[in-house]
Amino acid sequence: MVLISDAFGLEISPNGILVGHGDQAVLYSSEPKVELPVQLREGKVRGFAWSSLRKSQRLLLLYSENEYSLIRCTTSSENDLFQLVYEGETRDWINAALFLEDENESEDRKRFVLHTSHSALLYMEYDLTSNADCTVLELARCTDSSILYYTKLHGSSFNKLAIISGNAFGELLVWQTQFPTESDPKSVMKTYPLLLRIEAHNGVIHSIEFDLQSQLLVTTSDDRSVKFWNIQKSGDWTTAEIKPMFSCYGHSSRVMCVVILKIDDRTFVASGGEDSYVCIWSSSGELILKRRQQFGAPIWRLGFSQDAEILYSTSSTGNLVGQNLKEVLNRPKIESTILSSLGDANEFVRNLKFVNNEIIVGLSSLNRLYYTRISPDSSHENKWLMVNDFPSYKRTVLEVFDDIIATCGHRRITLHRYNTNTNDFEQLFDGIRMKGTIRSFQFLSRDRYLVSDNLGYCLLLQTHQLHIESHIALFNNREPWITAALLISEQYLLLGNREGHVMLYCRSSASDDFQLKDSIRYLHGKMGSNFFKLLSLNADNAHVMSGGHEAFLKYLSVRFSDSTLRVSQREGIPLAWVEASPSDDLILGFNDNHIVAWSRRNDILLQLACGGGHRCWDFRLSDGDSQLSIAYVKQKRVYFYRNSLYNAVDNRLKDIEPNNWHVRNCNTLRLITPRNQSDPFILSAGDDNIIKVTQVTNDSLSQRAEMHSHISTVRSLQAIPYKSNGGDSSTWLVFSVGGRSQLCISQLSIDASNKCWISEISSHTLHNVAASKTSTIEARLMAIDVVQHSDGDLFSIYVAGGDGNISHYIWELETPNQLDLKHFVDIQRCPLGIQWIASKGMLLVSTTNGEVYGFDRTLETTYFQLQLHVTGINTIDIYVDRHLLHILSGGDDESIKYTVLNLNNNNVEQKIEYLGLHNAQVNALAIHCPTKSVAASELFAYTCSIDRQIYRIDLSTHKYKRVGYTCIADVKGMLLDEHQRMYFYGCGLQTMSISNIL
């Protein structure tokens, strides 16, 4: 089934890449991936250790929180065979494990050590021949027993084993199993002295790495620092000296992992943090590279393949990402090259464009046109050559499309065509077409152009002779010229001006001129769109992507029937502003003073320091969009950069498909099933402010769409089926609430090919209706439910706010921006959930003080008020059996309550409490009727808690049993679908079949 969970374990070896994914362990190699035979009972895989190879066999030790497993790996010419041979438990958390090569060890026995979080060391031996129990040879303890968060073991024999740990107080602790101070032969227990205690950090130490040859030790911590230490020892570890060198700060959150890299006799340090960034440092502490790798998810582990020189990382979403460092750490290739100057000290390139992969043209400060050829060999210096017979006048615009070069100035336009064979620039046109100073020249195609000037005069020109095709009337603004243009069809033209307005024009039937039909003000603020990209076009509408000076892509919908333009969707991206979208996967833009290339599949591909986005620059993609060339002007000099966008990673990763699940907690989940399909789609939302649409197919997930309408955490959502416009598509209205008192309403359509279309309908801020009219208090909206009226376009929306208000609104699709408050009730407690019972016309409300309310449709009548728990009710599920309402609830009091309410007289007919099932707050439960019968005698329940244990309860006999556990940390809820699948969500997602756990 599906598992998206933390990947805490990562081990790089010649045999492949081992990843601990939740309670599973996967081996990635050049062969198809192998899932190891692991049967952990409660934990997540935290680490691995390999033994040496003997007689084509080796042992793999795998450990979780307090469990460990031994797996025999038999190597053959065809493939490796893995067999689980032993499982064990410890009483304390396991921090590290290591196989040893002691001198008195026999070939049939393997010795290893397990280090636990209170500085205890288990020295054990396993007999390969008998598959018997592991024998404890020694229990070693340190005189210090503080709580340890990370341990690094060093040594090949037990008598010379060094233990370097970091504790919760930021101290670095070192001890060695060589000279015990206390010994108990009966219990094989020995105590060893602490050799070093060093105050290292102002927080928990999360990782330690050292290299004795380089005399370098590195630690990371909660304090966001990467600290370098000098480590020296002349003999055993009693002679060790560790002295601080310097601290490096490049992360904005906790630094969770670190590795030391050796590349071409140079030493580097790589660190990964909760901010999803990987920083690469030189041995002197210089930050060489900072790159976001995991789409915003916290990075838990780093691993380095010395042979392939690839840095791997794992994250909270379970993704494994590899980055080839061969070129990344090659200084000439990660920095821009300064091209030669023009020769005259008073003349410089002030604007430039790529003509092809090798030729760059530049417009000089003296309004002369130059060109240069970029050699593949960086050792060859480029030369700027002046274009002969170039008309002399002051230029304001330089644009290039294929081999056509356009230069413009006051009223005048000049076109040249570059001949790749002769290197000649043929003049195609030179003449006056405009009234003022030309500010914009847009290539709509190779022979159609849109030109605008500072007076608002705009023309659509065609052919290389610039014949006037039509006049276009622009807004009479201070800066009316065009920044982006798209000819959608022969009838429709989309323009964006310098002041931020986007305008839709339609060609007049009486003339060839275009008339303004619709507009959107300040689509990307007051700086205008930088580009339009046509995504789809049919007889009814067109979909267009727009990017500008903000961290969002906007998706526009053009409807031809009434010539209207609207924003259908937005998408948040990790760029300060967007400049171009040259391919489906690639977005180019700026962050602060860097040019950034961002990939939907690979996250940040490039961060090139250029000085900021205000300067003139251009780009070129080549080699199948895999190589990016960038040229820009800085301080009157031209800089050039060229490198591969996508790092070549070895074939061990070629078949790994990364998941696109939430990088923060998932708070709510709903299942929807399109018509004529059996597998459901998942609607999910969480702390990353994103609503995701994910298709479930067999045992895999495929993300289909995202909604970025929320500005804060999404707490709850509902999907209401809505009538579609015929065809095979299915449509839902999605209502969602969360932080900043925001209610968002969107439309989701899924066609027969499973393509999703999102349309953001409206967004509302629901202020406290009891406060003053000038109040700006924004209470978090905790829950929502929606009822569709008999009139299909009219809806009742029930919203529960963190201020204690339950509000009833009327909303109509025809007027989406209007929200009519009908009534509200203040229950004086924070509501945690609401649920509409359609068959009874009743709204069920659960609260933080353990009460459940039943309200009528208008919220004016309270049917009942029951005290079910002594603390908050975190989760609730119901089942209606004629006049009986079955309520199953779980709360902070760690108990589960089963209540049967008679709705005829509102009397409680049965109330059962299940104690002792869980030892943490209960956040997930569901009532299950396996035969789909209405008979309450066949009701069962499944429950889950923060302790991750899953229980099954027979609600008729009240017997229960533990049936499994989930890997999902901080479980927020669970659902059951028609295929008997359970969905657990929280910090990840896990699906499992009921039949597999019974």
From Swiss-Prot:
Gene inactivation phenotype reads: RNAi-mediated knockdown impairs small interfering RNA-mediated silencing and leads to derepression of piRNA pathway-mediated transposable element silencing.
PROSITE patterns recorded: WD_REPEATS_1, WD_REPEATS_2, WD_REPEATS_REGION
Question: Can you supply a Gene Ontology BP term from the record?
Answer: tRNA methylation
Please give the function described in this protein's UniProt entry.
Together with methyltransferase Trm7-34, methylates the 2'-O-ribose of nucleotides at position 34 of the anticodon loop of substrate tRNAs.
Q: Can you name one GO molecular function term for this protein?
A: RNA binding
Q: What is this protein called?
A: tRNA (34-2'-O)-methyltransferase regulator WDR6
UniProt keyword Plastid present? no
Keywords tagged on the record: Cytoplasm, Repeat, tRNA processing, WD repeat
Start and end residues of the WD repeats are: 148-185, 200-239, 250-291, 294-333, 476-515, 527-566, 567-608, 664-704, 779-821, 826-865, 868-911
Q: Which GO terms describe its cellular component?
A: cytoplasm
Q: Which family does it belong to?
A: Belongs to the WD repeat WDR6 family.
Q: Which Pfam families match?
A: WD40
Assembly: Interacts with Trm7-34.
Subcellular compartments? Cytoplasm
The UniProt entry lists the main location of this chain as cytoplasm
